[in-house]
């Protein structure tokens, strides 16, 4: 179990250090936000799954999930601990890091989602034009 002030850090193999650093520092524009305050664990899990599926469908890659620090929950940081665990189980989640203070600090996480096949192709084509 995490503590209210603990940071959440998770990065899949293959995620470039520069990409992870940029996420950790809050440098990517936040494209969507989910607030889990006042939700039960079951409601929160359902909301997280639904939210991330919607984001993936809409080609949204950078989101913030506000879970709260859980200072008054019993046990402390219960929601935070579960959110950290759930996100690692979702294969479309590339990396996760606790947010900067201006986005919620240790009561929120940045989530970077996998790029769609379409977006990967666009990036590849853009780099090909630049190189060739």
Where is each model-derived feature located?
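Long, charged, low-complexity intrinsically disordered regions
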Residues: 1-62, 69-132
């Amino acid at each position: 179990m995490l503590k209210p002030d603990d940071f959440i850090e998770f990065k899949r193999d293959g995620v470039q250090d520069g990409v992870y650093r940029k996420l950790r520092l809050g440098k990517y524009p936040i494209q969507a936000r989910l607030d889990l305050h006042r939700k039960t664990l079951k409601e929160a899990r359902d909301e997280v799954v639904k939210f991330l599926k919607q984001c993936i469908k809409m080609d949204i890659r950078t989101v913030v999930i506000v879970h709260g620090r859980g200072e008054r929950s019993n046990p402390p940081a219960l929601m935070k601990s579960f959110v950290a665990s759930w996100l690692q189980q979702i294969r479309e989640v590339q990396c996760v890091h606790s947010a900067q203070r201006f986005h919620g600090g240790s009561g929120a996480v940045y989530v970077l989602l996998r790029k769609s096949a379409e977006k990967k192709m666009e990036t590849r084509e853009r780099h090909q034009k630049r190189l060739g």
